[in-house]
Amino acid sequence: SGSCTLETCWEKMPSFREVGSRLMEQYKGSAKVTGGNDGGTLIPEDSTVKPPSELDLVYSMDSPDFCEPNPRTVHSARRGVGCNSTSMDVGGCDILCCGRGYVEETVIFQVNCRCRF
């Protein structure tokens, strides 16, 4: 006589919100790096930062200052950008509008959700 055991394993994708939160945490903790002479090593520009692991988020160039007008673009730096007026974080209007003030606008739109009850 014999017995048979069936074992099934699977991994579930985290929610989109959880992925976004994890990515934001990594973004906030990211470090600027330069390439090592061996072509495979990443060296943090700040000597107080530990070398990154394969799972760390790093960058090699600073982002442009979006608060300064860009002569290559026709419009001013941040005009027409949506923001969150109540947030003091990265998506907040005070930060995105570079402290220059902003105009609040309420937009109401109707969407056909194709709901069934």
Curated annotation (Swiss-Prot):
PTM statement from Swiss-Prot or TrEMBL: Palmitoleoylation is required for efficient binding to frizzled receptors. Depalmitoleoylation leads to Wnt signaling pathway inhibition.
Any Pfam family matching the protein: wnt
Keywords per UniProt: Developmental protein, Disulfide bond, Extracellular matrix, Glycoprotein, Lipoprotein, Secreted, Wnt signaling pathway
Keyword Nucleus: no
Residues that span the membrane, as ranges: none
Similarity-based family: Belongs to the Wnt family.
Lipid linkage positions (O-palmitoleoyl serine): S1
Residues that carry a glycan: N84
Lineage start: Eukaryota, Metazoa, Echinodermata, Eleutherozoa, Asterozoa
Keyword Translocase: no
Protein task: Ligand for members of the frizzled family of seven transmembrane receptors. Probable developmental protein. May be a signaling molecule which affects the development of discrete regions of tissues. Is likely to signal over only few cell diameters.
Molecular function terms from GO: cytokine activity; frizzled binding
Cellular compartment(s): Secreted, Extracellular space, Extracellular matrix
InterPro entries, per the entry: Wnt
One GO cellular component, as annotated: extracellular space
Listed GO biological process terms: canonical Wnt signaling pathway; cell fate commitment; neuron differentiation
Disulfide-linked positions: C83-C98
Name of the protein this chain belongs to: Protein Wnt-6
PANTHER family according to UniProt: PROTEIN WNT-6, WNT RELATED
